[in-house]
Swiss-Prot record:
Residues 15-28 have a biased composition (Low complexity). Disulfide bonds join C571-C576. Forms a receptor-activated non-selective calcium permeant cation channel. Forms a heteromeric ion channel with TRPC4 or TRPC5 that has reduced calcium permeability compared to the homomeric TRPC4 or TRPC5 channel. Also permeable to monovalent ions including sodium, lithium and cesium ions. This is Short transient receptor potential channel 1. The lineage of its organism: Eukaryota, Metazoa, Chordata, Craniata, Vertebrata. It comes from Bos taurus. ANK repeats lie at residues 46-75, 83-109, 111-156, 158-180. The gene is TRPC1.
Amino acid sequence: MMAALYPSTDLSGASSSSLPSSPSSSSPNEVMALKDVREVKEENTLNEKLFLLACDKGDYYMVKEILEENSSGDLNINCVDVLGRNAVTITIENENLDILQLLLDYGCQSADALLVAIDSEVVGAVDILLNHRPKRSSRPTIVKLMERIQNPEYSTTMDVAPVILAAHRNNYEILTMLLKQDVSLPKPHAVGCECTLCSAKNKKDSLRHSRFRLDIYRCLASPALIMLTEEDPILGAFELSADLKELSLVEVEFRNDYEELARQCKMFAKDLLAQARNSRELEVILNHTSNDEPLDKRGLLEERMNLSRLKLAIKYNQKEFVSQSNCQQFLNTVWFGQMSGYRRKPTCKKIMTVLTVGIFWPVLSLCYLIAPKSQFGRIIHTPFMKFIIHGASYFTFLLLLNLYSLVYHEDKKNTMGPALERIDYLLILWIIGMIWSDIKRLWYEGLEDFLEESRNQLSFVMNSLYLATFALKEEAHNKFHDFADRKDWDAFHPTLVAEGLFAFANVLSYLRLFFYVYTSSILGPLQISMGRMLQDFGKFLGMFLLVLFSFTIGLTQLYDKGYTPKEQKDCVGIFCEQQSNDTFHSFIGTCFALFWYIFSLAHVAILCTRFSYGEELQSFVGAFIVGTYNVVVVIVLTKLLVAMLHKSFQLIANHEDKEWKFARAKLWLSYFDDKCTLPPPFNIIPSPKTICYMISSLSKWICSHTSKGKVKRQNSLKEWRHLNEKRDENYQKVMCCLVRRYLTSMRQKMQSTDQATVENLNELRQDLSKFRNEIRDLLGFRTSKYAMFYPRN
């Protein structure tokens, strides 16, 4: 029988020389006895082997014959092979759906049948298992199949449910079938949750608890599940990616897994947006506001561009979504507005347009102040024109700062409390305008969103320094009226402090120009790289300060006892030709010496001592400490800093287009609303538009207390609700179209890959096997059920 099973092997005629020698004829050191130490299951009978082999070959008629002959129940239809697979599992793996239906009708059972079908992504098998009804019951066995498998021998992770496994495979069709069965998922708790359930699970098995949370989030991050269960898939992907990013910082053991899932959610949102085919669909998607977000009622009634979804994408740091081509094209359209012809102009005309607007920006601001709703005012209101006008206003402010040093009077040099000049009052007007602009932005955006922008942080510090400068100048003018040489002034004289703050504020004012280069495709990526390098330098600074503090303490303790009295010193300072170690007698002096030693500005004599004879050991220790500092800081840490900066630059360079477009979009969005149209100092003048809005709001408030006003208010609310419902309905229609296109594109990608080729080959093999068995049965080649073991000539 075994020879028939293996016809290619001639066991009887095998040469004895080809077989290994018996252990008795060899030395014990030359052979190694092999023994199966695993659990040996009960060997199957011949009929059971035939039954499993027929299922594996896909022989429907043989399986049916064996099951019909098993009236006495001698055959164990739930038997398993050496791999632990029963007939149902084998049939599912081979995708023999007709045999699977036959086995289920005869009562074959498998606890993990549904999981095997989902894992193999056999959609037909999943459908059969979910809809199968036993002969003695009118209800399908779905309840048992949908239970979580807790068998550690199963190939997938423990505590796995069918819906979780289907989401891991990202199979849209299978998930659709499972969701019709009213399935549910346990809501994952926070990592630091101390509830009774989480405490018990952590105490019992912390690894299992963490892995189960990871499986749940891997399920939730499935694009197919997001499309099926989320009314707003884009918002769901945004929120889930933020949660996964936060989890990656907490559960560092699974950081790579959570970061990969967060990246998957970001790419899904980007790919879903890429399915938009026209500007109308993009407008509906990018202007949609969720129920949790504040809604601009006036903007909704006026059909104004609010770009709420785009602002939310920037808040959640969705760089892939914002830098997507469709989104960027829509942003360009909104950015130029009625100046759309500017992009098609030659370079010379572009420069002339910018210079003209930059020179006549005060006139343009006055025109908008007088007639904001006119055709000319609407052109000025476009984001592109606002950007140029605000930039020209800021350049004028910098010009006033340069003029400030030119109008400085030498005769007031020793005046302890000089009066403010005319240019000071001009600067104060600009500063008040910039502060008012920041206050309005803070009011509409909120403190958290306002402080997230580094541009707002720099503006806040700069304006605070200018306010402190002029406040100190005014205080000095009121308190001091004398003349004296500056060297006789107090170190913290208000005028001196004001000049120091003013100098630092001037530096920040010019550094603020870096934020304007984001609009340039050449300088923008360099600015982003510089910002990332500054972050890396902050990390490096913490390590450097620790090393500096360690060596400073050691050198100070070593040389403090050898401090030379002042009258015996030849000179002081680390740049002295006759330098001594007296620099190291204090903590501050040692810090300065070691810091400048990095830049080779400390004298070589820093290694010498002024100890007397017999204290060579202290001299050697001091030289060894400084030498070690030289190796650790000058050689190792500085090279580490260079490597960190190079890595940051390379990281930005690899994603240059994405990083630049995201940074540019953040800058552009600050000019899209109508909150800060006029630049400083014209924004501090009450405009007719503001007065009209105030009068309109006041009249509405007064009318709301009358009977007619209440009716009008109710009608306005009904109109607003109707528009809101219509907006949500349009959004759902567009989203359904995007989901269908996304599924179609994914199906086309799968058909063009090797996986589709393998699936086609499997289908061809199944068809050929089924055709062979049918022909054999029709021609009567099978004389007995054991004939399939024997080869035919």
